[in-house]
C-alpha cells in the first residue's frame, strides 16, 4: 500500500527553510525558540446593519466561509444600545480564527493574490502594530479574493484581519511579516 504524503503549504515551507534562518541572523537570537512565528490569523467581519435586517448576517457568513475555508462563528451583541436599535444577543458580526495549515494557506493567498488585486493599492501601513508584534489591518471589500464571485455579491463588506505572532516587539513582527511577503509602505 502506498502512503500519500501530506502536501505542506508553500509559505510554511518557505518560513521553515529560509525565513527562520534570515530572522535568526538579523536579530542574533541565542535560542531557536526566540525566532518569531505566526500563531494565528483572525478574520472578523462586522455587520452592524444586521441589527435591522437579520438576513444580512447570512451573506457575511457565506463570504467568510468561502474566503477562509472554515465555518465562521457568529458574534452576538453583549449589551443593548438604544441609539443603534440594538438588543442584547442580536447577531452583529462573524469571525474566523485560522491556525495551522489553513492559516499558512490563507496568508499565502492574501499576500500573493488578494492584496495585489486591490485597486490603487500602495502598500500596507507599517504603523498598525500593537506593541507586541501583532498586526491588524482592514480591507474595504471582499471582491479582491478570487473565491468570491463578483456577480453574486449582494453588497460590499469590509473585514479586519489580525495576524498574531510570537514576536516580542513591533520591529521583530514587522521583519517577520516583511519576510513573509507583506507589502509595507516605505515612509
Swiss-Prot record:
Pfam families: Ribosomal_L5 (PF00281), Ribosomal_L5_C (PF00673)
Keyword Lipid metabolism: no
Gene Ontology molecular function: rRNA binding; structural constituent of ribosome; tRNA binding
GO process terms (BP): translation
GO terms for cellular component: ribonucleoprotein complex; ribosome
InterPro entries per the UniProt record, alphabetical: Ribosomal_uL5, Ribosomal_uL5_bac-type, Ribosomal_uL5_C, Ribosomal_uL5_dom_sf, Ribosomal_uL5_N
Record's keyword terms, sorted: Ribonucleoprotein, Ribosomal protein, RNA-binding, rRNA-binding, tRNA-binding
Cited function: This is one of the proteins that bind and probably mediate the attachment of the 5S RNA into the large ribosomal subunit, where it forms part of the central protuberance. In the 70S ribosome it contacts protein S13 of the 30S subunit (bridge B1b), connecting the 2 subunits; this bridge is implicated in subunit movement. Contacts the P site tRNA; the 5S rRNA and some of its associated proteins might help stabilize positioning of ribosome-bound tRNAs.
Family to which this protein belongs: Belongs to the universal ribosomal protein uL5 family.
Record text on subunit structure and interactions: Part of the 50S ribosomal subunit; part of the 5S rRNA/L5/L18/L25 subcomplex. Contacts the 5S rRNA and the P site tRNA. Forms a bridge to the 30S subunit in the 70S ribosome.
This protein's name: Large ribosomal subunit protein uL5
Organism: Nocardia farcinica (strain IFM 10152)
